[in-house]
């Protein structure tokens, strides 16, 4: 058979195989188009589970007459126009395939009117070449899409459709997910002429609880713990059910959204499951409704044809962010109410954060700051609610209310004299390497220290920092779960070594499970997170096999010397961060620098030589 260009209808039908899986897929694509058009009301009519009719009507901005034919063409969209747009998608649709694909496997009619037009226009495609016909019609501002006889021309696909009830249940589930994503939109769903669901638009107040309860049930509503978590450009809000009260019904409630897009993401599910695993049974699943907001440049949604999956550029960061957010809420829920004493409130330690000029701006009197607003926005996305809008938030509402009422009856505490709250903060800065002037590539920092100039070897400072982080003690890094556990094959002798050294390794933050011929690394301390564990762990086992006794300090020293550097080419910010951590965790190193770390530079000799010339 010779190579030939496929007819447009056949090409669209092939694309429809990826985009249009069943009637629920059609509903999802069309409703997302309505949301992108700024609709505040969407009416969905279904007949015979979507096999006979799917009608979506909205009050969005509409489509101009001269763009109707393009709307039904393949790879035609108003959502993106360049690669820059593709790399920072904020709309739900962007491929330009949905309408063309749906039109190729059904009898689709598109009727639309914009606010600038006096009349509406209707378009439909037919024939082998999918020629579009446009004619006048009566219609208010907005768009209506009718999909008749789905898969009428692809009998094989139609044969795989399930019963009317099953197909409608899939549609109902899609609408539930969309209704949870957009509280500000009214959505009505009818089946065979009977109204099945009515989700009224709600404001930013407590009415959101009503929609949440209508979709997820009162059982979830009563057990829901509110989450409000933010770090830089990452923000997470929503609800997670108390794991102590989990049952089979609640376990079916697992809804997550990324920038308003409903998602089934294994990374997100794994992070939540890991945060709840101590309180869940082996066969139980967590229940949650979570909204993750991230810089669109940091997430790729152009992964799955139906846009069910995304790819995060910093997946480990996102995983740990979600894990810590969920875990913190669960831990605070388990904590008893804070006891009130008459002791004076101790000053809160101020974290170290050195700047390039050598001044610690965070050691100065702190001023309350408002959270930064996201640096990206979408006109179609719902405004972010505050924590007060979430139902049943015992951590943020019940405890604070109880404490506040107690404070009203608490006698005034006399202010103690001769209290120097700034002393603890100043003590942390008594030892300093000085001011970082510049970086001499690839790994030297030029410092101004006590009116003298010195060179500092950044890899050596980094090695000492990792050593102190690996050494058990008050400053030791705790075990951090791995996103994907590392499984290595080991011999019987190596298994024996690991079992003998297990206490020391666990103390250092390395958690593992030993099997017959394998070891699975489940958690490691912070310095090991970016390392190649496939190579490091066998070397560590070899080192331990040569030891007659196991000492955490010696093991930490060996590991620090064998870890790869996190930086090939150092920057000012990286150097300042590492030096600040060394000053905080190991001030003795600043007071008495070891050999190979710091080298004074004699500028006087150089200046004298220049003057002599």
Swiss-Prot record:
Positions of the UniProt region annotated as Disordered: 364-393
PROSITE patterns in UniProt: DNA_MISMATCH_REPAIR_1
Keywords: DNA damage, DNA repair
Presence of keyword NADP: no
GO biological process: mismatch repair
SUPFAM superfamilies per the UniProt record, alphabetical: ATPase domain of HSP90 chaperone/DNA topoisomerase II/histidine kinase (SSF55874), DNA mismatch repair protein MutL (SSF118116), Ribosomal protein S5 domain 2-like (SSF54211)
Domain of life according to the entry: Bacteria
GO molecular function, one term: ATP binding
Claim: DNA damage is one of the keywords in the record: yes
Pfam families: DNA_mis_repair, HATPase_c_3, MutL_C
UniProt GO cellular component terms: mismatch repair complex
Function: This protein is involved in the repair of mismatches in DNA. It is required for dam-dependent methyl-directed DNA mismatch repair. May act as a 'molecular matchmaker', a protein that promotes the formation of a stable complex between two or more DNA-binding proteins in an ATP-dependent manner without itself being part of a final effector complex.
Family: Belongs to the DNA mismatch repair MutL/HexB family.
PANTHER family, per the entry: DNA MISMATCH REPAIR PROTEIN MLH, PMS, MUTL, DNA MISMATCH REPAIR PROTEIN MLH1
HAMAP family xrefs: DNA_mis_repair
Name of the molecule in the record: DNA mismatch repair protein MutL
Annotated source species: Enterobacter sp. (strain 638)
Lineage: Bacteria, Pseudomonadati, Pseudomonadota, Gammaproteobacteria, Enterobacterales
């Amino acid at each position: 058979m010779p190579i030939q260009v496929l007819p447009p209808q056949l090409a669209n039908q092939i694309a429809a195989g990826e985009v249009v899986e069943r009637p629920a897929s059609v509903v999802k694509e069309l409703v997302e188009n309505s949301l992108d058009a700024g609709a505040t009301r969407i009416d969905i009519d279904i007949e015979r589970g979507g096999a006979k009719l799917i009608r979506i009507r909205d009050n969005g901005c509409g489509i101009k007459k001269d763009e109707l034919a393009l709307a039904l063409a393949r790879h035609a969209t108003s959502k993106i126009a360049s690669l820059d747009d593709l790399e920072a998608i904020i709309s739900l649709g962007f491929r330009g395939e949905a309408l063309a694909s749906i039109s190729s496997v059904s009898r689709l009619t598109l009727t639309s009117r914009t606010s600038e037009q006096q009349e509406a226009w209707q378009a439909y495609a037919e024939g082998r070449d999918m020629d579009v016909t446009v004619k006048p019609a009566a219609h208010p501002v907005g768009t209506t899409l009718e999909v008749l006889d789905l898969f009428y021309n692809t009998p094989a696909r139609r044969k795989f459709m399930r019963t009317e009830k099953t197909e409608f249940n899939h549609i109902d589930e899609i609408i539930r997910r969309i209704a949870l994503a957009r509280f500000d939109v009214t959505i009505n769903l009818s089946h065979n002429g009977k109204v099945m669901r009515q989700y009224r638009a709600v404001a930013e107040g407590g009415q959101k609880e009503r929609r949440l309860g209508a979709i997820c049930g009162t059982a979830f509503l009563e057990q829901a713990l509110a989450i409000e978590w933010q770090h830089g450009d990452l923000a997470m809000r929503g609800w997670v059910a108390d794991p102590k009260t989990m049952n089979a019904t609640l376990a079916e409630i697992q809804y997550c959204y990324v920038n308003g897009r409903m998602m089934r993401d294994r990374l997100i599910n794994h992070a939540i499951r890991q945060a709840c695993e101590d309180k869940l049974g082996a066969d139980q699943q967590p229940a949650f409704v979570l909204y993750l907001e991230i810089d669109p440049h940091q997430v790729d949604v152009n992964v799955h044809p139906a846009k069910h999956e995304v790819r995060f550029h910093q997946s480990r960061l996102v995983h740990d962010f979600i894990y810590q957010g969920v875990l913190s809420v669960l831990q605070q829920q388990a904590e008893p109410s804070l006891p009130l004493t008459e002791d004076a409130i101790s000053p809160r330690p101020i974290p170290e954060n050195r700047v390039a000029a050598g001044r610690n701006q965070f050691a100065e009197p702190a001023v309350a700051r408002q959270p930064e607003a996201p640096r990206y926005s979408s006109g179609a996305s719902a405004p972010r609610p505050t924590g007060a809008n979430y139902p049943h938030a015992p951590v943020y509402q019940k405890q604070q209310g109880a404490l506040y009422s107690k404070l009203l009856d608490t006698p005034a505490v006399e202010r103690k004299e001769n209290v120097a709250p700034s002393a603890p903060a100043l003590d942390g800065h008594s030892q300093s390497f000085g001011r970082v002037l510049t970086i001499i590539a690839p790994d030297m920092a030029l410092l101004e220290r006590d009116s003298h100039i010195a060179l500092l070897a950044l890899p050596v400072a980094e090695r000492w920092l990792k050593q102190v982080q690996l050494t058990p003690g008050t400053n030791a890094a705790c075990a951090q779960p791995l996103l994907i556990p590392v499984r290595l094959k080991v011999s019987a002798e190596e298994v024996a070594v690991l079992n003998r050294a297990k206490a020391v390794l666990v103390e250092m933050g390395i958690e593992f499970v030993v099997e017959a011929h394998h070891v699975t690394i489940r958690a490691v301390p912070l310095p090991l997170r970016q390392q190649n564990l496939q190579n490091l762990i066998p070397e560590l086992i070899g080192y331990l096999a040569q030891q007659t006794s196991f000492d955490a300090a010696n093991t930490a020293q060996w590991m620090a010397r064998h870890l790869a550097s996190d930086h090939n080419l150092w920057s000012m910010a990286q150097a300042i961060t590492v030096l600040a951590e060394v000053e905080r965790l190991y001030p003795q190193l600043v007071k008495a620098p070891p050999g190979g770390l710091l080298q004074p530079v004699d500028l006087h000799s150089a200046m004298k030589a220049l003057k002599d010339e």
